[in-house]
Amino acid sequence: MTAWLGFLAVFLCSWSLRDLVAEACTCVPIHPQDAFCNSDIVIRAKVVGKKLMKDGPFGTMRYTVKQMKMYRGFQIMPHVQYIYTEASESLCGVKLEVNKYQYLITGRVYEGKVYTGLCNWYEKWDRLTLSQRKGLNHRYHLGCGCKIRPCYYLPCFATSKNECIWTDMLSNFGHSGHQAKHYACIQRVEGYCSWYRGWAPPDKTIINATDP
């Protein structure tokens, strides 16, 4: 009887742990510009290899990458060879395919290693919009002093001059919404931040902060 109760306790603990892990990865929607500005490293790279590292209870996946271009992180790590992520998607680990695609990868540096996850911005390069690519090259950097405030229900108003109101959540698009795909929040000379879209330099075409 005692042995059976012991087995039941272990089973229930294992089941609870499994449920906890399955529900562990929850990410708050973030605009690509904020994802860029909050990252230590932003690169365009192709995955050329992977290896499961036996560290931690669930392991860590180490991806070997061929860096094509760096957009952020020159002073921290000018060349990235490895990207680390949790081996399990339930722990926010990302799954990248080897020798197939070029990816945009953002991440943070910890003890000399670049870590990324589902809550970081990563995407197949050919799925990025032209505006997002231009943002990576210079526009997002120009807006790192701005604050992008999500709007979950109307009305929404900017509470300071450096805010842009992000309304993609009103239609549940979030990261893949129209503003996320096509707009950057740029700071002007006067210190005001506004949404910007277009092919002219940011100081020539500025739109209203609440009207993307």
UniProtKB/Swiss-Prot annotation:
Question: At the top level of its lineage, which domain of life is listed?
Answer: Eukaryota
Is Acetylation given among the entry's keywords? Answer: no
Q: Name one GO biological process term.
A: response to cytokine
Where in or outside the cell it occurs: the entry states: Secreted, Extracellular space, Extracellular matrix
- Tell whether Metal-binding is among the UniProt keywords: yes
Q: List residue numbers at the site (Involved in metalloproteinase-binding).
A: N38
Q: Which UniProt keywords apply?
A: Disulfide bond, Extracellular matrix, Metal-binding, Metalloenzyme inhibitor, Metalloprotease inhibitor, Protease inhibitor, Secreted, Signal, Zinc
- In this chain, the stretch annotated as Involved in metalloproteinase-binding covers 25-28, 89-90
Disulfide linkages recorded for this protein, renumbered to the chain, are C25-C92, C27-C119, C37-C144, C146-C193, C151-C156, C164-C185
| Gene3D superfamilies associated with the record | 2.40.50.120, Tissue inhibitor of metalloproteinase-1. Chain B, domain 1
Domain NTR residue range list:
25-144
Q: Which Pfam families match?
A: TIMP
What GO cellular component term, any one, is given? basement membrane
- CDD domains reported in the protein's UniProt record: NTR_TIMP
Q: May I ask which residue range the UniProt record assigns to the signal sequence?
A: 1-24
Just give the chief location class.
Answer: secreted
Please give one Gene Ontology molecular function term for this protein. Answer: metalloendopeptidase inhibitor activity
Q: Report residues binding Zn(2+).
A: C25
Q: Which family does it belong to?
A: Belongs to the protease inhibitor I35 (TIMP) family.
Q: What does this protein do?
A: Complexes with metalloproteinases (such as collagenases) and irreversibly inactivates them by binding to their catalytic zinc cofactor. May form part of a tissue-specific acute response to remodeling stimuli.
Name of the protein: Metalloproteinase inhibitor 3
